A protein has these predicted regions:
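Short, proline-enriched alpha-helix->beta-strand connector loops that line the catalytic pocket
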Residues: 72-74, 207-213, 235-240
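Post-His helix in hydrolase/transferase enzymes
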Residues: 253-267
C-alpha cells in the first residue's frame, strides 16, 4: 500500500470517527429531551398492539409476514441501560415496526436498581408474563448496556433460555468496563468491573443454554472501556459478535444499520437457537 493511499484511508477513518462522535453528542442531547417521556411507565411490560391485518403495510412489512408470520409476531422486549428508561428505544421501536415486527414491549427496571441478579429475577418474571400473555413460549429481548447484562444473567444463569429465543445486546459490558473502577463505592457499578464476582460468574460453564446471542460492540463507546469488552466471548454460548465502527454508546439504539441487522437476524426462527444470517 502506497503512503498516499494509507494517508487517505487514515483520513477517512478519522472522519468517520469524528462524525460518529458528533452524532453521539446529538443523540445524547435528543435523549435528554425524550427522557421524561419514559418516566411514566410501570415495571411490567407495556404490551404493544398486535396487528394481523396486512392492509396499509409496506412491501417490506408484507414480505416479512409472507415469509414468516411467526417471526414477525414473536414478541420483542426492549430493556434499557443504566440510569435510563425505555425512551432510548423510541427510534429502534419505530424502525422494527417499519420492518414488520409488530409485537414490541418495553420494560423499565428502575433507577434504584443496585443488584444485577435480583434485577434479573424481576426481568424474568416480566418475560414470563409477556410470554404467557402473548402465547409465545419464547420471545426475543433487545438489551442496551446494563439491560443486556441483566437479561444475559436471566438467560444464562436462571434458566431464561427456556423463555428467550434470541438476546440482542447493544454496548453491553459483557466483560465489564474499566470505567466502573472510578466509582467503586456504588454496589451496582462495582459489579461492572472486569474482575467482579458477577463477571466471573457469567464466565462459568453454561452448557445446554438454548438461546442465541447477538452482541454489538463499538470502537468509540465511551462507557464500555475498552469497547471490545462489549463482545460476548463464551465457549458454551451460541454467539454472534458484530463490530460497529463510528457508533457511540447512546447512538447504538438509534442507528439505522444496527436496526436493519437486528431485523435480519430476527427474520428467521430456528428451534435450536441457531441464528439466521444478518
Amino acid at each position: 500500500m502506497t503512503p498516499a493511499r494509507l494517508s487517505r484511508l487514515v483520513a477517512v477513518d478519522l472522519l468517520q470517527v469524528a462524525s460518529g462522535l458528533a452524532i453521539e453528542a446529538a443523540w445524547g442531547t435528543a435523549h435528554l429531551m425524550m427522557y421524561p417521556l419514559g418516566l411514566f411507565s410501570a415495571s411490567s411490560p407495556v404490551l404493544a398492539e398486535r396487528r394481523h391485518d396486512r392492509r396499509g403495510l409496506s412491501p417490506e412489512q408484507r414480505g416479512l409476514l409472507h415469509h414468516g408470520v411467526e417471526a414477525a409476531e414473536t414478541p420483542i422486549l426492549l430493556v434499557h441501560g443504566i440510569i435510563d428508561n425505555h425512551a432510548i428505544f423510541t427510534v429502534m421501536e419505530h424502525a422494527l415496526r417499519r420492518r414488520g415486527f409488530q409485537t414490541l414491549s418495553r420494560y423499565d427496571y428502575g433507577l434504584l436498581t443496585q443488584n444485577i441478579p435480583r434485577a434479573a429475577v424481576r426481568l424474568g418474571a416480566a418475560i414470563e408474563e409477556l410470554s404467557a400473555a402473548t402465547g409465545y413460549a419464547r420471545i426475543h429481548v433487545i438489551g442496551h448496556s446494563l439491560g443486556g447484562l441483566i437479561a444475559r444473567y436471566y438467560v444464562q444463569r436462571l434458566g431464561g433460555d427456556q423463555h428467550v429465543h434470541t438476546l440482542v445486546t447493544l454496548g453491553t459490558p459483557h466483560q465489564g468496563t474499566q470505567l466502573a473502577r472510578a466509582a467503586p463505592l456504588l454496589p451496582l457499578v462495582r459489579q461492572l468491573t472486569p474482575d467482579s464476582p458477577l463477571i466471573q460468574e457469567l464466565a462459568e460453564p453454561a452448557q445446554g443454554c438454548r438461546a442465541r446471542f447477538v452482541a454489538f460492540y463499538g470502537d468509540i463507546d465511551h462507557l464500555v472501556v475498552p469497547g471490545r469488552n462489549a463482545r460476548l466471548d463464551h465457549p458454551d454460548l451460541n454467539v454472534q459478535n458484530i463490530a460497529v465502527h463510528g457508533v457511540g454508546h447512546l447512538s447504538m439504539p438509534n442507528n439505522g444499520r444496527i436496526a436493519f441487522t437486528i431485523a435480519q437476524a430476527l427474520r428467521e426462527l430456528h428451534p435450536d437457537g441457531t441464528p439466521g444470517t444478518p
